[in-house]
Amino acid sequence: MESQTKFDYESLAFTKLSHSQWTDYFLSVPIDDSELDAITREIDIIKPEVRKLLSSKGDDETSKRKVLLIQSLLSLGLAFHFENEIKDILEDAFRRIDDITGDENDLSTISIMFRVFRTYGHNLPSSVFKRFTGDDGKFERSLTEDAKGILSLYEAAHLGTTTDYILDEALEFTSSHLKSLLVGGMCRPHILRLIRNTLYLPQRWNMEAVIAREYISFYEQEEDHDKMLLRLAKLNFKLLQLHYIKELKTFIKWWMELGLTSKWPSQFRERIVEAWLAGLMMYFEPQFSGGRVIAAKFNYLLTILDDACDHYFSIPELTRLVDCVERWNHDGIHTLEDISRIIFKLALDVFDDIGRGVRSKGCSYYLKEMLEELKILVRANLDLVKWARGNQLPSFEEHVEVGGIALTTYATLMYSFVGMGEAVGKEAYEWVRSRPRLIKSLAAKGRLMDDITDFESDMSNGFAANAINYYMKQFVVTKEEAILECQKMVVDINKIVNEELLKTTTVPRRVLKQALNFGRLLEVLYTKSDDIYNCSEGKLKEYIVTLLIDPIHL
């Protein structure tokens, strides 16, 4: 029987996580503001030259070349510099799409055009790929001689919706051939490296900063690369690296001033650089530098709160904390136990700290909406804990819905809007509060991916609130069958997400992109069933080194 004052967390087989190894390193990295200014000036000199390439007049072939250029800009991390030009080009080209694509028989070109138009919300039909299939509906075997074309088709297949059956065939066809290319080593090394990276995570679901860093290395090895474009991409990424390190310094100093490390139980994770990295997955552009610091603070708070709910609080303790958060009254802090009091004080401090900035811009509404989502989040966590430790057995569907809230789906989108300031309006918050199908699908995806990854550890820790566990019980299947079915659900959800991104035409593209970026965050964190947020080695270390430590040579 659980104690009414303290949950026996010491009885859990919970493995203590190491604290972040990166904080001291990034505090010691020097930043030269004069270098940052010099890079910015050179970028401003080159950008008009690229803009000329985008604004040139011409025929259908010219429009086609522009679309291919847009894909290069996306892959190199440069598209945000030219959003207005890209919008105009694609709107004009889509009106003439049949003329532009009609006689085109190059697999790579059609695949790239498909990706670009769908990325920007233009629903180019997947029937454009029928020209590459035989009478049996299968893709022609002769296509396998075109490695870049196959790779482009593989990327395009990840933008499929629930009715794009030809893209299901394309994914099966391309993935098997790309794996054969890796084994056979028949391509040049830089192409094989790109194939390996893409098979791990396609661009559709990878974080933009990683895409840019990897593609710059690939593009430089291409014999026909544009030297001006390559120079701009390198300068841009170097500028991003400088911004990122400055942000980390700001966040790490804030965390150190809190002085909370010695007060936390050993079960709590202090994932400092990791909390910032999760914010980077939501937006990588330099204009959202302040937003990433805001995101890091929220992520730190949410990580501590998650650990307290899962591994420390008794149900009565958590109930009192939830009540206190819902009242949001400073006086209520005196009703809480020690750790609860520290966490609630941290929440108050985070909101006060961020509130000073948004109120100065007349954006206090944004913080109010974020607070409302925090209240919903802590209530959902309480429900999960009651299910995990009590005798209640929710349905699989109920767990996925409530667990999607507890996973911070809605809260993460809200704090990303707060960090964007006036770049998004009230309609963005109202849209998320309406719980549209797109966001509910992402919440379900996150819950499923997290529970697939954590199933073994949840069970060994005695934490029953897991989708795999509930699916096994509800449908009387084995663990392996439950995992397979949940993995299929994730694949189907990705198609629904793609579909909703195309169908949702009343919401600004920047807001929709935040939803897509949350989907990317989930893929980065949980692909290959490897929870990189809680593992300081492996893929997480690779990302940190690639994005922040390895210099990009100008």
UniProtKB/Swiss-Prot annotation:
Keywords: Cytoplasm, Lyase, Magnesium, Manganese, Metal-binding. GO terms for cellular component: cytoplasm. Its EC number is 4.2.3.40. Induction: By wounding. It catalyses: (2E,6E)-farnesyl diphosphate = (Z)-gamma-bisabolene + diphosphate. Predominantly expressed in roots. Expressed in the cortex and the sub-epidermal layers of roots. Also detected in leaf hydathodes and flower stigmata. It is an enzyme of class 4 (lyase). It is found in: Cytoplasm. Pathway: Secondary metabolite biosynthesis; terpenoid biosynthesis. Its cofactor is Mg(2+); Mn(2+). A motif (DDXXD motif) lies at residues 306-310. InterPro entries: Isoprenoid_synthase_dom_sf (IPR008949), Terpene_cyclase_plant_C1 (IPR044814), Terpene_synth_N (IPR001906), Terpene_synth_N_sf (IPR036965), Terpene_synthase-like (IPR050148), Terpene_synthase_metal-bd (IPR005630), Terpenoid_cyclase/PrenylTrfase (IPR008930). Mg(2+) 1 binds at D306, D310. Involved in sesquiterpene (C15) biosynthesis. The major product is (Z)-gamma-bisabolene with minor amounts of (E)-nerolidol and alpha-bisabolol. The Asp-Asp-Xaa-Xaa-Asp/Glu (DDXXD/E) motif is important for the catalytic activity, presumably through binding to Mg(2+). Belongs to the terpene synthase family. Tpsa subfamily. This is (Z)-gamma-bisabolene synthase 2. The gene is TPS13.
